């Protein structure tokens, strides 16, 4: 068992409450809102950090209908998939998934519940807001997020009746239909909602062997129900939510590396179409109890996922059905009171994940490789995060997290008739901390500094590999240093930060695709600057602009990739959009024009597969025809810019996945109330 300590951070987080409580002044107490992001608006963790919050109308205006489209509205975030939607590649501030398909660098939360890694890319249903927190968040969130947190908050049912239907069509015979109804079942006591969604995003890739010409897309069906028991004049409430999502996809579709404008897949003669079906069931029980000084929240959540996946790989046909089960429990307590000198959050967290994989690699005339594997992972954690308001302008924050991680694996199989197998268990302990300080230079201008640690747990490879023992990889750990500022008035919002992140024991996949193994690849350093601003230059009009420059490299003492760039991290990025409202006698018109620039980046640790700089231009025009009817048209990627989203070496040649190109669509929404 190995204990990792960084005493200045951990001890600072432990000692700060005692120091602060010793000097707590006698002040009037009043209610302090604890948001879905687990922070009060006055806490250091809410203010001494780089963050972006996007509302539901902003998501709709930008055409964000799934989590992999969030980079359109969350500056600095990059999301693609490596092969298909099961395996997301995420980077933020130079911290990258780096081909670690089963453990993204940024954790996705939905209503306080961390999602399965294979469910990170999902359609969005009835979203109220999305928040991005940059940098490690392990002393505030139960699941230690190394690079940051994406926190999706959905609309909760209350006494206000809501309901609408949506429908739309777009390029490549794609369409979207949605129904939502929410409101009181018994006003003052019980509330409920239901959401149904059908979302089809077909592709246009061609398999010459089968004649299929719509490959590369997804078709999702989703249902969600919520109940909220919240008696009037009572300090408690309870909630229940259940959802089911089934998605069919044909995304394991590749073209030749230099054929990014082509539509014919790079396949062996006679290869079948790629196919994947993913079904995910989720259930959540939640409770909240409020006293004069504290608010207590309890969440217990379960997710069950199974998927089947078949795709051609060279001369082999691969079948990889997999089952996942995850349950999460979290208890959190937070202080209340606007005038408190000390604000605190304490939490206990448990996560248990179980996985079973069956895989078969078949040659045209005989089986080549088959295996069955079982893996488990469990995390037990306790965390605290607090703020000491030294004056009305100066505060310091600190936090500490203790984690105990356990994992196990057991697998067996045969390769060309030769059996193999092994099993193993491992456990590890981590102590993480964070410290921050912030000062209000004026009523509108704040400067801050922050130091925080993050990690990805130790564990075992999910996919068994013949000839290799069950050897665990160790935890990947990082420390982030940040200096930032935020300025906000009624007309202008500006935030900027410079940061440095050092990561050691990086977890990186290597080897042939389909048979890759995860191991520790050494150390990496990421440095960068980021800026985002919004100017509301006229009533109903705003201009957004953002940019970042990042240098993320493996250090010279990294065993495999010394001096190379970390995969999936663009060297720079930028974006700008103009949004407006034009009042006419026939209803308001809402134009939007947005451009996004993504810098060069690599898809592999060897830095052999490089995607160059590209830019896309999106436009939309909404029309509020009546109080309850909205019609919008949009053109995404107006100039049909084609670029690679993922690539790998297939033998001696490289293949790539490419984006879908220009998409034109029209959507209509009708509100019931």
UniProtKB/Swiss-Prot annotation:
Keyword entries, A-Z: Cell outer membrane, Ion transport, Iron, Iron transport, Membrane, Receptor, Signal, TonB box, Transmembrane, Transmembrane beta strand, Transport
Gene3D superfamilies assigned: TonB-dependent receptor, beta-barrel domain
GO molecular function: siderophore-iron transmembrane transporter activity; signaling receptor activity
Domain TBDR plug: 41-155
Signal peptide boundaries: 1-22
Ranges spanned by the short sequence motif TonB C-terminal box, renumbered to the chain: 657-673
Domain TBDR beta-barrel: 160-672
One cellular component (GO) term of this entry: cell outer membrane
SUPFAM superfamilies: Porins
PROSITE patterns recorded: TONB_DEPENDENT_REC_3
A Pfam cross-reference name: Plug
Motif TonB box, chain ranges: 30-37
Compartments in which it is found: Cell outer membrane
Membrane topology of this protein: Multi-pass membrane protein
Function as written in the Swiss-Prot or TrEMBL entry: Receptor for the bacteriocin pesticin and for the siderophore yersiniabactin.
Matching NCBIfam families: TonB-siderophor (TIGR01783)
Protein name: Pesticin receptor
Organism: Yersinia enterocolitica serotype O:8 / biotype 1B (strain NCTC 13174 / 8081)
